[in-house]
Amino acid sequence: MIAPTFRPATSSDVAALHRLVESAYRGDSAKAGWTHEADLLGGQRTDEAELLDILADASRVILLAEVDGVLTGCVQVADQGEGLAYLGLLTVDPTRQAGGLGRLLIAAAEAEARSRFPATRMEMTVIRQRSELIAWYERRGYALTGETRPFPLDDERFGLPQTRDLEFVVMEKALG
């Protein structure tokens, strides 16, 4: 794999960023990768307005991964206060998954959380039914906390649930 470069997203990246996220999380294109939610959720994963809101918030950043100038992945880091940061929107182009880019994005997000906020812990939420993804995060040093959070079942901005028993599990890692 060619080493990616990482940089913070800007408003001029939003259209391409939105296409990347949707291609990795929803619909038939997502099924080219192993991390999709297409069997659990239809509809959208996010929209351009939400991405612009994230970029306008000084407590959040979206890091882009580019290879030879081509957008290949992204991750959001958000300051939660008291040394806690949140990792979300981890996205790798479905045609490039299983090549190590996800690990590099997590490492970049953790470094960003330590330097920008400065965080000593990182948390994330994962849909409970995504056991293969939970196991992947565990191999990256994240542990289940035992906490669950409700999935916004009736908010179409986050997708159209194919089942009503969706919920998030919370995972956390101490940042060294």
Language-model regions, residue ranges each:
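Conserved N-terminal entry element of GNAT/NAT acetyltransferase domains
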Residues: 1-15, 19, 169-176
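Conserved GNAT-fold acetyl-CoA-binding loop/helix
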Residues: 22-51
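A short helix-loop-beta-strand connector motif used in the catalytic cores of GNAT acetyltransferases and
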Residues: 46-63, 164-167
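Conserved beta-strand in the GNAT
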Residues: 64, 70-78, 86-91
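A conserved beta-turn-beta hairpin within the catalytic core of GNAT-like acetyltransferases
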Residues: 79-90, 97, 116-120
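Conserved acetyl-CoA-binding loop-helix of GNAT-fold acetyltransferases
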Residues: 92, 98-111, 139
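Conserved acyl-CoA
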Residues: 104-121, 143
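C-terminal "cap" of GNAT-fold acetyltransferases
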Residues: 120-135, 139-176
